[in-house]
């Protein structure tokens, strides 16, 4: 199986790996954005944006609409953020590839960034930070990276510091998204 690669108008590169005869398919979009590309005033923005992508679009107004559409087909879907990338994926029946592509496109380019959802997600992310700090393995990894890269964004926490998560304005999140997506 030879990968097929195409560069889109916005500069993103799409790569497909055909799998003949498979009953399911996975579409995963990797965006070259993570905590290493952030500045101190928006540290955590990549991860914050990842959360907001699932909170509603112009055509799918809220989380429930997105999940109902995917759950109807037994889809598995999620996202993750690292130091140098953010990825979004959907795995589902291969016959529904068009839906998966349409939904990911809608989430990536037409998410609403509803102010109420942003406020709700602040608390979700703050709880996630608490969870990381309560997990010795995860917390030690963060402390090691902080020590190894003290003067670099590579030493920063992917989720960001609590103060930034509490206060980063919607406009800064949208500007950051517009710069990288």
Regions picked out by a protein language model, each given a short descriptive name:
Residues 1-24:
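N- or domain-start disorder-to-order transition segments that initiate the globular core
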Residues 4, 16, 35, 53, ...:
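A glycine- and charged-residue-rich anion-binding loop/surface
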Residues 7, 18, 65-181:
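Charge-rich, well-structured scaffold segments of protease-associated domains
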Residues 12-14, 37-40, 48-53, 107, ...:
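A broad, low-specificity signal for short, low-complexity segments enriched in glycine/proline
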Residues 21, 26-91:
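M16/MPP (pitrilysin/insulinase) zinc-metallopeptidase core fold and M16-derived inactive scaffolds
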């Amino acid at each position: 199986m030879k990968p097929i690669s195409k560069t889109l108008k916005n500069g993103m590169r799409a790569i497909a790996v055909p799998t003949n005869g498979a009953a399911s398919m996975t579409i995963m979009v990797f965006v070259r954005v993570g905590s290493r590309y952030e500045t101190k005033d928006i540290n955590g923005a990549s991860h914050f944006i990842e959360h907001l992508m699932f909170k509603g679009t112009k055509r799918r107004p809220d989380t429930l609409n997105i999940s109902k559409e995917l759950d109807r087909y037994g889809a598995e879907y999620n996202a993750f953020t690292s130091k140098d990338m953010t990825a979004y994926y959907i795995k589902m029946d291969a016959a529904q590839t068009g839906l998966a592509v349409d939904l990911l496109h809608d989430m990536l380019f037409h998410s609403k960034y509803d102010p109420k959802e942003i406020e709700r997600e602040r608390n979700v992310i703050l709880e996630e930070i608490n969870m990381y700090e309560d997990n010795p393995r995860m917390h030690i990894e963060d402390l090691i990276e902080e020590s190894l890269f003290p003067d670099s964004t590579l030493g920063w926490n992917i989720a960001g510091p609590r103060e930034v998560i509490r206060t980063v304005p919607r406009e800064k999140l949208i500007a950051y998204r517009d710069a990288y997506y």
